[in-house]
C-alpha cells in the first residue's frame, strides 16, 4: 500500500508563502519554484498534478497571486479536483464535500 504524499508548488507570486509553509511543514515535497524570479505558473501546476495523479492518496498545494490561474491550469487534468480557498473553513469544505485533491491558495 502506497503512502500519502503531499506536494507543493508555486509561481513567483506565491514563493514567499510557500517558503513559510515549508518551514512549518518540512515533510511536504517542494516542486518549485525555487526563487521569486518570474516563471510561468502552468509549468508548476503541471508538475504538481502529475505527482498527485500517481497515487489516489496524494494531495497537493498550489500557490499563485490570485489562485485563479493555478486553479484553471490544475483542473484541466482529468482526475484533479483543485479548489481555491482563502480561509481554513473553505479549505476544509472543499476537501470534505468536494473531495478536492489540490488546495489552491492566493
PLM region spans:
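C-terminal binding/interaction regions
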Residues: 7-16, 20, 88-106
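Short hydrophobic/aromatic-enriched beta-strand-loop microsegments
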Residues: 28-30, 80-87
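Structural motif
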Residues: 38-47
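Extreme N-terminal starter segment of soluble prokaryotic enzymes
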Residues: 2-6
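Helix-adjacent hinge/juxtasegments
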Residues: 48-84
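A short beta-strand-loop structural module common to alpha/beta enzyme folds
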Residues: 27-39
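Solvent-exposed alpha-helices and their adjacent loops that cap or buttress functional pockets
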Residues: 1, 53-55, 95-97
